[in-house]
């Protein structure tokens, strides 16, 4: 059952389309570049197509892209509120050659790292919940002990009052 789910997720990961664009800005935000992807929009009134480029913030895991690079990006890799794409590979480098830059990890490596981070987060959450449950149990035991001490003190007081009478 688990292996079929894992296989299905691996297949669904590979179903994303590939977009090609030019790196507009790089180096301003760590592990993030802005990529302009070309496109067209049809104007119904003029019955004509106009250029309508889109700009995306793209996850660059090793800061290996430079402004002017032509890259292939893949949507569907959500890393933050505004980053929804990841670099797949460099098509045409601008400036320094690809060999002199840090390597771009493969998509499988990225997904494995993301899954490992998610598993570690889940493990930390389970440990935190166990810790909170243990602290609550200790607090409850302390409250019960204080209540028992008060109860014993009250009974001793009542007994001492009955002996005086």
Curated annotation (Swiss-Prot):
Protein keywords: Mitochondrion, Ribonucleoprotein, Ribosomal protein
Name the UniProt record assigns to this protein: Small ribosomal subunit protein uS17m
Family matches, as PANTHER family: 40S RIBOSOMAL PROTEIN S11 FAMILY MEMBER, SMALL RIBOSOMAL SUBUNIT PROTEIN US17M
Function: Component of the mitochondrial ribosome (mitoribosome), a dedicated translation machinery responsible for the synthesis of mitochondrial genome-encoded proteins, including at least some of the essential transmembrane subunits of the mitochondrial respiratory chain. The mitoribosomes are attached to the mitochondrial inner membrane and translation products are cotranslationally integrated into the membrane.
Species this chain originates from: Neurospora crassa (strain ATCC 24698 / 74-OR23-1A / CBS 708.71 / DSM 1257 / FGSC 987)
Domain of life: Eukaryota
GO terms, biological process: translation
Family: Belongs to the universal ribosomal protein uS17 family.
Oligomer and partners: Component of the mitochondrial small ribosomal subunit (mt-SSU). Mature N.crassa 74S mitochondrial ribosomes consist of a small (37S) and a large (54S) subunit. The 37S small subunit contains a 16S ribosomal RNA (16S mt-rRNA) and 32 different proteins. The 54S large subunit contains a 23S rRNA (23S mt-rRNA) and 42 different proteins. uS17m interacts with the F(1)-ATPase inhibitor IF(1) dimer.
Any Pfam family the entry gives: Ribosomal_S17
GO terms assigned for molecular function: structural constituent of ribosome
Highest classification ranks of the organism: Eukaryota, Fungi, Dikarya, Ascomycota, Pezizomycotina
Protein's cellular compartments: Mitochondrion
One cellular-component annotation, GO: mitochondrion
């Amino acid at each position: 059952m688990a292996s079929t789910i894992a296989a299905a997720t691996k297949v669904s990961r590979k179903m994303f389309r590939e977009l090609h664009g030019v790196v507009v800005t790089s180096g301003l935000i760590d592990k993030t570049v802005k990529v302009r992807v070309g496109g067209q929009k049809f104007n119904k009134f003029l019955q004509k197509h106009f250029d309508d480029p889109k700009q995306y913030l793209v996850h660059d895991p090793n800061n290996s892209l430079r402004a002017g690079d032509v890259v292939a990006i893949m949507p569907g890799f959500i890393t933050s509120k505004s980053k929804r794409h990841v670099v797949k590979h460099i098509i045409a480098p601008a400036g320094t050659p690809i060999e002199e830059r840090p390597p771009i990890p493969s998509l499988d490596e990225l997904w494995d790292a993301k899954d490992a981070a998610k598993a570690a987060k889940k493990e930390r959450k389970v440990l935190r919940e166990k810790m909170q449950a243990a602290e609550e149990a200790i607090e409850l035991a302390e409250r019960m002990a204080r209540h028992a001490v008060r109860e014993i003190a009250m009974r001793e007081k009542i007994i001492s009052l009955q002996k005086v009478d």
